[in-house]
Regions:
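Non-heme iron-sulfur electron-transfer modules
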Residues: 2-13, 51-77, 91-122, 134-172, ...
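FAD-site-proximal beta/loop scaffold in flavoenzymes
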Residues: 8-9, 139-161, 368-393, 476-548, ...
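Phosphate-coordination loops involved in phosphoryl transfer and adenosine-cofactor binding
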Residues: 19-21, 93, 120, 262-265, ...
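Beta1-alpha1 glycine-rich phosphate/pyrophosphate-binding loop at the start
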Residues: 20-84, 149-153, 172, 178-192, ...
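A Rossmann-like FAD-binding core segment of flavoenzymes
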Residues: 77-119, 312-361, 373-391, 413-521, ...
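Short cysteine clusters
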Residues: 123-129, 133, 173, 177-178, ...
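Long hydrophobic segments that form regular secondary structure
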Residues: 391-425, 483-498, 522, 530-531, ...
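A conserved FAD-binding loop/helix module that cradles the flavin
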Residues: 407, 544-569, 743-755, 886-916
């Protein structure tokens, strides 16, 4: 007999009192039987189950052999008894990380409680959340034959009957959004036809959906998992569809100011994306917000920097109504001279979002000439409605970023004869988005790379030409791009009527330099997390802090600032508080791996107006998608994170039970003994590729067939997966993954013959005219009534063919040809056609049981089952004193044997506890 193993605790570990007498690991039939037996003896039992319900695999079955009694009718009373037993505590949706035994004989159990995102104390199990959930995932209860919802109750007879939200992490599209917009959520809602709900979800995070649907650079699409396959989901186009549809139906917002208004006042300096976002979120919290804008109109960069052919100004106007509807007061032509003035006016906090509205100069001769301007100066005039006649003129734009592309394309629409973008590096190094560059070239903009202005040439104070130098690329600079080096003697002159300098923008923060700390580049010094400045009541964000950035980033900064301004005004600490902690991003490789049968759905190309039509007006270049196109595009979403955070369940729940802020919890318990009842694993038919499982839809395994036959089955009858046809010629292939050295599993699984006979008889009950054939090597009928059960099957007309199946091939009509060795017919190779084949897969050891105890202390037998020290004289006793094993964790067993073995394990545990009490 092997010696028992003990893990020694460090001497400074204090003595502990056990919380429970017994820990039972696993809530299947073995775990429940052991727990109930010990609970009835008066012992305190902790039952830990990793799923959201107890019941194990028995609850999945249709009926039990050989009596053909209802599996649910037997198991559900036991589940209820376990759940309500006064001496049993069930800890569901939890996993054990490690179990260690100390010198005091007690076991320390480290637990990981997985978040359900539902308060089970409040949940009534009504199922309303499942009805409205927009994400479909494979249904494990029905062997993945059909879908269930991400928010779901495990199965109809679940104990407890409580909802769980499947969140694998945050979807890459949502995780990468700087504003925290739940892209996965609104895409899923559009897919479900819930367009208004999609709009409202967006408004929870960002109040400028119309502007974002046109001018956002869509980092979400860049991270879309589908983009690694045949093309990204058109997230921005889907957003535009839902926004345009909503705005057409709602010219003004449906809501007004909040009912509860706080006494504190907040000033926002600047009405660009950051300022508007902060004002919106602060107003929703009940603050009285005033926005000060120096320009004649509201919108900042949205209005003055982005041309109408990309972002129509009526869309900006409608977006701004989302903010003013909350009671936000926006004062245009109201520049703020000092922050002290705002304090004197009674404002309790200030959000400084002055933006970057000033361009840099090149510092070359002639820059003061009439006809030399910066990109913001040019765009302000053009977008502000000032008449600019560029007909017949040559315009040059210096720079390689997006701020260079917009003036160039705008100049063409204003009638310029020739437009040149001059950039000192190569096109490869241009920071502008490639699609923007392509659009400019398509419209006729010339690209002059590896050139830079040396001086501007004028006549009578007006620009006439530019003298440029040719450049070559040298060694990389601090940015990682190769440094441009002038080529001596390469000067060349180009006639130019208008020069637009798009070489960068600087923040409009100079008026506040004496009051708050600024960086050398003029940006505001603000805490990266809280955005609080050197003046405690002043917060700052957007381009004023980051320098020139993207709209969505500025919106995110405004949202962040509102969170911390709210805490500041409530007198709460800003230290140690994190703003929006999403779940970790989902690994794209894992997403692709879990969708092996993905149907390729090519992405629809972006549609634009013809070039001639574009240049004739300021009409939007990009054309909208139709409702059908939007939903089709949304249907390509892979639901990377599981739950999409659409919050439909939150709105539908009458008990208010959903809490998406839940996170994984760690816990420790101390117990006196352990029963391992982790059950078994089923053989994966894919490991026998010649049998076609996973390749041919009409090759299924026995668990899938059990679900098709169960009273709670996914369909009204037995249907084959490929076409929904009722099969009339069904085959069973026994010993799939059992007694097979090619898959390293030499053992007989004991139950496959009988469960196949059970299913065959049930099939004849459901499909009386069906032909059922069982391919077998031999039939194991060792239990009480098993031989009679076999004879009963033969008497019902089920065919038995003694022979080993070698291969299964699919016919064009979905039928399957089975190639087998006909042992009783002379041993020759035969072929038989069936329209559905069931693989009677074997039972495998659950190796997770061995990993519960660090260091390999829990020994296994030669087949990786938990080893019993002496299965005849000491059934259930393992290599660790005080640890016992029950059911199929130690060997393949049928249900009656599992119940008996669990009783033995419980008896052994009780005897061990008595010995501990006596100190022997």
């Amino acid at each position: 007999m092997a010696e028992t193993a003990t893990l020694t605790l460090a001497p400074d570990v204090p003595a502990l009192r056990p919380s429970y007498d017994v820990l039972v690991v696993g809530g299947g039939i073995a775990g429940m039987e052991s727990a109930l037996t010990l609970g009835d003896m008066g012992y305190k039992v902790l039952l830990v189950e990793k799923e959201a319900s107890i019941g194990g695999k028995m609850i999945l079955l249709s009926k039990v052999f050989p009596t053909l009694d209802c599996a649910s009718c037997i198991s559900t009373p036991k589940m209820a008894s376990t759940s309500h037993h006064p001496n049993i505590t069930t800890l569901l949706y939890s996993e054990i990380e490690a179990i260690t035994k100390g010198e005091d004989g007690l076991f320390r159990v480290k637990l990981r409680k997985k978040p359900t995102f539902v308060d089970w104390a409040a949940c009534t199990g009504c199922g309303e959340c499942e009805i409205v959930c927009t994400v479909a995932l494979p249904d494990e209860f029905n062997a993945d034959l059909v879908a269930r919802r991400a928010t779901h109750i495990a199965f109809p007879q679940a104990v407890p009957k409580k909802a769980v939200v499947d969140r694998f992490g945050t979807s890459p599209c949502s995780f990468t959004c700087p504003a925290g917009v739940k892209a996965h959520g609104y895409v899923s809602l559009v897919r479900a036809g819930k367009y208004d709900e999609a709009f409202h979800l967006h408004m929870e995070d960002a109040p400028l959906p119309g502007s974002l649907s046109r001018a956002c650079y869509a980092p979400c699409e860049g991270e879309c998992t589908r983009g690694t396959l045949e093309g990204t989901v058109p997230i921005r186009a889907i957003k535009r569809f839902m926004v345009d549809r909503y705005y057409a139906a709602h010219p003004v917002p449906e809501y007004g100011p909040p009912e509860t208004v706080r006494s504190e006042k907040v000033a926002v300096v600047g009405s660009g994306p950051a300022g508007l976002s902060a004002a919106y979120h602060l107003a929703r919290r009940g603050y009285r917000v005033t926005v000060f804008e120096a320009a004649p109109k509201t919108g900042g960069m949205l209005r003055y920097a982005i041309p109408a052919y990309r972002l129509p100004k009526e869309v900006v106007d409608r977006d701004i109504l989302n903010i003013t509807a909350l009671g936000v007061d926006i004062r245009t032509e109201s520049p703020v001279r000092t922050l002290a003035d705002l304090k004197a006016q009674g404002f309790d906090a200030v959000f400084l979002a002055a933006g970057t509205m000033q361009g840099f100069k090149l510092g070359v001769p002639g820059e003061e000439l009439d006809g030399v301007t910066d990109c913001m100066g040019f765009l302000k005039r053009a977008n502000g409605g000032e008449a600019m006649d560029l007909k017949g003129k040559t315009v040059m734009v210096v720079g390689g970023g997006n701020s260079a592309i917009d003036p160039a394309r705008m100049a063409l629409r204003l009638g310029a004869k020739k437009v040149i973008i001059q950039y000192r590096r190569s096109r490869k190094e241009m920071p502008a988005h490639d699609w923007e560059i392509e659009a400019a070239l398509e419209e006729g903009v010339e690209l002059q790379v590896l050139h830079t202005p040396k001086r501007f040439i004028g006549e009578s104070g007006k620009l006439k030409a530019v003298e440029s130098l040719t450049m070559r690329l040298g060694e990389p600079d601090a940015s990682g791009r190769r440094r441009p080096v002038p080529v001596e003697g390469s000067e060349a002159t180009t006639p130019v009527d208008l020069m637009v300098l798009a070489i960068g923008l600087k923040p409009s923060t100079a008026p506040f330099a004496a009051e708050i700390a600024l960086n050398k580049n003029g940006t505001v010094k603000a805490d990266k997390e809280t955005l609080q400045t050197s003046l405690p009541y002043v917060f700052s964000g957007g381009d004023a802090v980051t320098g020139p950035s993207m709209i969505v980033q500025a919106i995110g900064q405004g949202k962040r600032a509102a969170f911390y301004v709210d805490r500041f005004l409530r007198g709460e600490s800003l230290d140690g508080v994190r703003f929006e902690e999403p779940l970790p991003v989902v690994d794209k490789g894992e997403v692709v791996a879990r969708t092996p049968n993905l149907t390729p759905l090519p992405a629809a190309p972006r549609r634009e107006r013809p070039v001639a039509e574009r240049l004739a007006s300021m009409a939007e270049v990009e054309l909208p998608v139709s409702e059908e196109e939007a939903r089709k595009g949304a249907s390509r979403c892979l639901d990377c994170g599981g739950c999409c955070e659409c919050h439909e369940c939150v709105h539908a729940c009458p008990a208010g039970a959903f809490h998406f802020e839940m996170r994984e919890e760690k816990a420790e318990e101390v117990v006196r003994s352990v029963i391992v009842s982790t059950g078994f694993k089923l053989f994966d038919g894919r490991r026998k590729p010649l049998l076609g499982y996973g390749r041919f839809p009409n090759v299924i395994d026995a668990m899938e067939m059990d679900r098709l036959l169960a009273p709670t089955r996914p369909y009204n009858t037995v249907l084959r997966p490929s076409d929904g046809k009722m099969p009339d010629n069904i085959a069973y292939v026994l010993c799939t993954g059992s007694r097979d050295c090619t898959v390293d599993h030499r053992l007989c699984s004991r139950v496959c013959c009988m469960y196949s006979l059970k299913q065959a008889q049930l099939i004849l009950g459901a499909l009386p005219l069906a032909d059922v054939t069982i391919y077998y090597m031999d039939i194991r009928a060792f239990g009480k009534g098993y031989e009679e059960f076999f004879e009963q099957a033969r008497g019902m007309g089920i065919s038995f063919v003694k022979g080993k199946v070698a291969q299964i091939d699919e016919q064009p009509n979905g039928n399957l040809v089975v190639t087998y060795e006909d042992i009783e017919g002379g041993g020759g190779k035969r072929r038989m056609e069936h329209d559905l084949v069931v693989l009677s897969v074997g039972l495998l050891p659950n190796r997770e049981a061995l990993s519960l105890f660090p260091g390999g202390l829990l020994e296994s037998d030669a087949y990786a089952y938990v080893r019993e020290v002496d299965e005849d004289l000491d059934p259930g006793k393992t290599s660790i004193d005080g640890v016992f094993v029950a059911g199929t964790a130690s060997a393949a067993r049928d249900i009656p044997d599992t119940v008996l073995h669990s009783g033995a394990a419980a008896a052994q545990t009780a005897a061990y506890l008595k010995r501990m009490e006596k100190g022997s």
